[in-house]
Amino acid sequence: MIKKNNESWLIVGLGNPGKEYERTRHNAGFRAIDVLADRLGCKIDRLKFQGLYSQVNYEGKKVFLLKPQTFMNLSGRSILQLSAYFNIPPQRIIVLFDDISLPPGRLRIRADGSAGGHNGIKSIIAEIGSQAFPRIKIGVGAKPHPEQDLADWVLSSFSSKEEKDLCSALNRSAEAALCIIDHGVPEAANRFNGSTP
C-alpha cells in the first residue's frame, strides 16, 4: 500500500469548462494538460471528483491528469477530492496554469509559494491547506493597458503571434511536468525557467 502511494502523482491543468473559454488566456492550463495527455497516449474523459480525469502509468509511477470542472475560482475542491481519495500529498501535485506576469511562450517553475493573485491557485491553497505544491506557470502576457479589466483580459484570446509562442510553451510545460516527476523541481526549473519559444 505504501509503495503505491509513493508512486502516485497528480498533474492538474487549470481552466474554465465550456467551448466559449477554450482558447482564452485563462485556459492555458487546460490546453497544457491536453498536450501532456496526447504525449502520454491517454484521454482526460472520466467524470468524477468534480472534474475530468485520466490515470496512466508513467515510468512505473501512477499518474493522474485532472481538469477541474468547477470553474477556475473553485478548482481546489476538485483537486482536494482526487488527492484525498488517492492519498497524494501536496508535494506530488503539479499544477499548470496561466500567468499574466510572463510573456506568452515563457515558463516559470516553482516548488511552492503564494497564490500571487491567481484565484485558481488561491482556491487550491485554501482547500488542501498547503502552498507546498509544485507549479508550472505558463506566460499569457500582461494587460496592454493598466486600466483594462483583468477578468476581460484573461478571458480574451491570443493574437496569432502569441498563439504560436503559447503552443511552444504548452509543449515545454508538458515536458517540464514529466521532468519534475523524473528529476525533481530544481532540475526542471533549471532546464525550463526562462526558456523561450
Q: How does the language model describe each region?
A:
Residues 1-112, 122-137, 143-151, 156, ...:
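Nucleotide and nucleotide-moiety/phosphate-recognizing core
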Residues 117-120:
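Hydrophobic alpha-helical segments within soluble ligand-binding/sensing domains
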